[in-house]
Amino acid sequence: MDNNSTLNNITITVASSHNNTTTNSNNNNNNNNGSNSNNNNEQLNTLSNSITSLKSLNISGSGVITNNSEVNTPSEGNITPLPLLSLSDALSPLRELYSCLYVGDIRALMSNQYLKFEENEKIRILGFPEPHLEIDEKTQKYFSYQIIEFESDEDILSIAKSFEQYSQLILGRTPTQPVVIQECCFGLVLASIYFIKYELFSLPQAHDLIGYNDFFGTSKKHSHFEKVDSCTLINDITSYYYNNMSSKRKTTIFSNNISFTNLQTTTPPTTTTTTTTTTTTSSSNNSEQIESTSKNNSSGITSPTSIKPKNKVGLLKKLFNKMDKESSNNNNNKEKVEKIKEKKESKKEREAREAKEEKEREEREKEHQLALKNIPPAELYKHHMEQIQKIQKQQIAELNATSPDGGNDLSNGSNGSKNGNNNNNNNNSNNNNNNNNSNEPNSQHQNHNPITNLMDQELIENYDDGSDRMKNSKTIISPNFESLPDEYKTMVKTWDIKQESVDEHFEIILSLLHFHTKQRFYSSDPTNLPDKPKYYNVGNVCGNCTPPMILDPAGSGQMVVAKSFYKRPFDQICKKPTNEMKKLYTFREKVGKGGFGTVYLVRNNMDKSKSRIAIKKLPHVRKKEKKFNVKEIRVLEFTNHPNIITYYNSHMLHDEVWIAMEFMEGGTLAEASNQYPFQESNIAYVAREVLQGLAYLHGIQLVHRDLKSQNIMMTTSGEIKLIDFGLCANLSKGERIRMCGSPIWMPPEMIQQKQHGYTCDIWSTAICLLELANRNNKLRKNPIKTMFMVGSEGIKDPFEDPHKWSDEFHDIINKCLQMDPHKRPSAQELLKHPFIQLADNKKKMGKILSSIFLKSIVGI
């Protein structure tokens, strides 16, 4: 027997049993159940067993489950009452998108009468009006229903009116008041994200972006709307609506009504007063209901109870039909063209194509073999340069072929002139030439080409592999540029640095070559130079770094002076693997990947207070990896501050280390700077939180040394925390001289391979704040050239729009970007700067960050 038949039999059994034992039943019920009066005990036993089986099957949502208060009336001794469900039990069958945000069938949820929540617990539901849904008075207090209803779908602006309240409902959820989105409404919520993403929190802005009657223009009244194509925006909304919502809604309601029809047609018509969802008395009425519901659903975004005239088609429907036809026509045309090409292709052409593919495979294999061989870095660099130029030429040729105007703009932009094209094709020959004038067009081309712009950054990450061949490489002595080997001169010329600057700051060029290749470069014989100490006396470079005050780790609740950092044995803080690791954690999804490892969202099965955590998986094979992993775990285990990510534990598994820490719902500063134009008060808030974390680190004699926008986490509740401590150093012995960190954020003393201390983090903080102010950071365009500029002269013009910002902001940035590290203020001194007093409060910042990361919150 299928589920629908089982439910139907139970419904009839309850009705007949109840009508046979109740004196106030009507005549129809008495007639229908008169033949069953002698079988009450047998029916009640059957009912009890069926309810128990239904509970194990977790059947729900068809609107036929009977009212349990009346089911238990006849003979309470023979029936075991179902256990009451808590909030977590009621939410368990639903699909969790993010913390406290679920999608599922609200009919089954709201018709469940076995609910027992705590006093302050309530489920907030977002969905369409449900005309057939009747909530029992006992469970009504557990729900708050937000109805999605639009006056008309003729105008996209009428839809935009309600987006703000829906987003605020989602953002305002808590563990005690989670939000459940009706399954068929999920597509509409996805569509609203596009408006929230472009800050459409008011109707005038929606008017300005989309226009009153023209849906194919682009508004440029607001600077952050310039790149928004309103036509694409509407198409995206329409696609999401019809793909994710309309079909689901039709299927859901249609299947529910079909189940009603099956129930009514398989048994004699019986009126059941005990069901929470009212059913009709005949199959013909159900058919009419199905037909009317389908008409309502086919009319676009509208209330299920309203029916649109046949001759009136909604705007979204028109747009979707047009887009659907265009896409189908394009697909058909593509298939036809491909078939014609296949027919026209001769045997000789097919052989040539196969030979070309074989050659490409051989080249890829050759590149792989080259990477494995013990070859000098310069040769590997040359090989990669050739591959990059080859890919670059292919992409330019493809773009020129597909461009509607023949690609003239692209050609002019990349080559400058017809002669510039020849320079581009003969790039290698020009690079081997010492004539700098012949290489200038190429340099300009590289600055404007995204492939070449990212080349230096890619090489920096790929060549710093820490292998033994780098350490055992020979020392190169070169007093000037002309005495460098040819392969390194070629490398320097690709950096787009003027020759007079190269000659003037040749020591910095040697430092950059060392950073690039891990070869040792000297301008004179190192045996004649005095030995450099590994550590330098800290002196005044650290500033006035007094030990910070923190909450007592023992739990007394009092503020105590933090102890200086000390190393604990690694085997005491990193647990060994156990056979129950799978029972401890359930991995859900990958949420991030960096240069050191991969981060996963994980459910902690043993500790419900820390149910959602993040686990960072780090390779633990090479000596360099082990060094960084041990350092990061020691720092995380020792630190205890609100602006530093919370550490839970770590595990050693084979050739990996797992670090378990708090999961931060939000994103990085780098992600936020690309999605939102931060105001000065917002930037001051970020500066204050970062400086508080640095003041704590410096107070316990630690320096981060890899502070960048990707290592600053921001949460939807307004928290700012520092992460990634693999390069963190203990300065209790003195300053370091090692060149490390990321190019854009590296201070000048580190680029010059001089001693560095706490104030290297101050420089990096200023660069992060400039990312928020400038957004399109010009420092990223050429990382190596930026490093040379920082090492030789610093950053002279930090702001792209200096008139936009206050004198306080200019002052704090100028103090942080002092070339002399001794002149930079400490983190504690900067916290007293007037700029910090402009900071927003945490509540306001939480709302801003929530709107920034709303896209990830709803799971798209």
Swiss-Prot record:
GO BP term (any one): regulation of cell differentiation
Protein keywords: ATP-binding, Coiled coil, Kinase, Magnesium, Metal-binding, Nucleotide-binding, Serine/threonine-protein kinase, Sporulation, Transferase
Bias (Basic and acidic residues) ranges: 321-370
Catalytically driven reaction(s): L-seryl-[protein] + ATP = O-phospho-L-seryl-[protein] + ADP + H(+); L-threonyl-[protein] + ATP = O-phospho-L-threonyl-[protein] + ADP + H(+)
Record-level GO cellular component terms: cytoplasm
SUPFAM superfamilies associated with the record: Protein kinase-like (PK-like) (SSF56112)
Coiled coil: 321-375
Cofactor(s) demanded: Mg(2+)
Sequence ranges of Low complexity compositional bias: 265-281, 406-439
Chain residues that bind ATP: V591, G592, K593, G594, G595, F596, G597, T598, V599, K616
Chain spans, region Disordered: 17-45, 264-378, 401-450
Biased composition annotated in UniProt, kind: Polar residues: 282-308, 440-450
A Pfam family this chain is assigned to: Pkinase
Catalytic residue positions: D706 (proton acceptor)
InterPro entries: Kinase-like_dom_sf, Prot_kinase_dom, Protein_kinase_ATP_BS, Ser/Thr_kinase_AS, STE20_Ser/Thr_kinase
Alphabetized GO MF terms: ATP binding; metal ion binding; protein serine kinase activity; protein serine/threonine kinase activity
Enzyme Commission (EC) number: 2.7.11.1
Domain Protein kinase: 585-836
Stated role: Coordinates organism morphology with cellular differentiation during development. Negative regulator of sporulation, synchronizing encapsulation with culmination. May have an additional function in prestalk cells.
Family (UniProt): Belongs to the protein kinase superfamily. STE Ser/Thr protein kinase family.
Protein name, entry field: Probable serine/threonine-protein kinase mkcA
Gene label: mkcA
